[in-house]
């Protein structure tokens, strides 16, 4: 972790810890080294919207790179999570002193911004079934949600997160998952759903009607 690690501060957050709150003064940028950080906006009591889950190699809190910015979401560690934090001052020093090595970090931030713009497009243009398939496709790239044979595994405790990522009620998600089972895309075992990622990619391709498929923000390798 040489280059960026020389400038940032490493921290380990326990599961459920709130790293920052929406509306708080923002500074710098965080990089996830291990674990997951859920970015969530509260809509009402017991409900929220999750635009993205930051995983290993991804950034969050980059609002802090703008002058006078405030955080746009809450950020919570969903499990024990290790992050690297660069304050605005440390980030500027990194850019000034290691200009060539800042390109991967800036590319990562831009990739994640593009993903959020695509997420807005989904909310405006796709129905619940389509948004669910896109979300499942995104989750299938995270080994936390997959079985050893590569299938996506959704358990009962994942349903709230799905609701918040898709932007739909629990009832709508349950119906959409049932339709995936009927279509042969998902297999149900009790309260658990098993899905082959390739079937999601094929179905998502059908929904895009010839347009470019929805991209997943790529992960930056820190060396």
Q: PLM features: residue spans?
A:
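Phosphate-/nucleic-acid-contacting segments
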Residues: 139-223
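Residues that scaffold the ATP/ADP-binding catalytic core of kinase and kinase-like folds
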Residues: 40, 62-63, 93-94, 135, ...
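Polybasic "coupling" helices that flank or enter modular domains
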Residues: 78, 96-167
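Short proline/glycine- and basic residue-enriched helix-capping loop/turn segments at helix->loop/beta transitions
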Residues: 1-15, 70
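Cyclic-nucleotide recognition modules
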Residues: 1, 52-114, 118
């Amino acid at each position: 972790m040489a280059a960026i690690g020389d400038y940032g501060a490493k921290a380990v957050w326990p599961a459920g810890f709130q790293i920052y709150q929406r509306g708080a003064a923002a500074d710098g940028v965080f990089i996830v080294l291990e674990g997951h950080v859920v970015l969530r906006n509260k809509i009402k009591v017991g409900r929220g919207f999750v635009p993205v889950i930051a995983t290993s190699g991804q950034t969050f809190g980059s609002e802090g790179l703008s002058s006078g910015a405030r955080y746009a979401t809450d950020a919570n560690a969903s499990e024990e999570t290790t992050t690297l934090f660069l304050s605005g001052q440390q980030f500027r020093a990194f850019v000034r002193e290691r200009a060539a090595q800042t390109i991967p970090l800036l590319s990562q931030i831009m990739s994640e911004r593009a993903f959020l713009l695509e997420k807005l497009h989904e909310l405006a243009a796709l129905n619940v079934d389509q948004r669910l398939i896109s979300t499942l496709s995104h989750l299938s790239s995270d080994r936390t949600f997959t079985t050893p044979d590569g299938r996506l595994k959704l358990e009962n405790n994942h349903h709230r997160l799905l609701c918040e990522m898709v932007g739909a009620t629990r009832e709508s998600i349950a119906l959409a998952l049932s339709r995936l089972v009927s279509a042969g895309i998902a297999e149900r075992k009790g309260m658990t759903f098993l899905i082959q990622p390739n079937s999601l990619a094929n179905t998502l391709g059908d929904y895009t009607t010839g347009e470019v498929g929805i991209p997943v923000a790529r992960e930056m390798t820190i060396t």
